[in-house]
Amino acid sequence: MKNKNVQYLDNIKNSVNDLLDFYTDNHRKTLSIRFDVRYPQNYTGDTSSKNISDCMAHMVKKYKRRKCDPYYIWVREQNKSDHPHYHCLFLLDGTRVKTYNHVFKSVETIWNSTLDIDRDSKGLIDYCTNKSNRDYNGKMV
């Protein structure tokens, strides 16, 4: 019998694979963008999953207007910190968009707005990039 953590991770992996299979089956090109979303260190507001759901709903609305057929999945993680953080995968129609840096700027602005903090606050979105490999994120499939 598998332990609960392994079963949980298998469920997440299967959900991600199902989403990727669905999206790539329905689009000639898929742009996948990975990022992590955090709360400010001294944040005293609500830290429920409603915040990330609202943020991603705004992201979807923005990219639907651009006809990029956005889809996403996120996973909440909370280790020893007071606040959870989220691992996110955002998918866009690769025939409609070629680059991904605008996604980081958008999610930064929308997350700050969701938390009702300064729009220009930085450091809450981890771009999941690798300095030695500029093509580490924003994979086109």
How should these model regions be labeled?
Residues 45-47, 84, 98:
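Short acidic, gly/pro-rich beta-turn/loop elements at beta-sheet edges
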Residues 18-79:
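Signature for HUH/AEP ssDNA processing cores
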Residues 72-94:
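Histidine-centered divalent-metal-coordination microenvironment in nucleic-acid enzymes
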Residues 33, 72, 86, 113-115:
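A broad, low-specificity signal marking well-ordered, structured residues that form hydrophobic/aromatic
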Residues 1-31, 94-141:
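Catalytic "initiation/cleavage/transfer" segments centered on a nucleophilic residue
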Residues 51, 88-90, 102-106:
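Generic preference for flexible, low-structure residues
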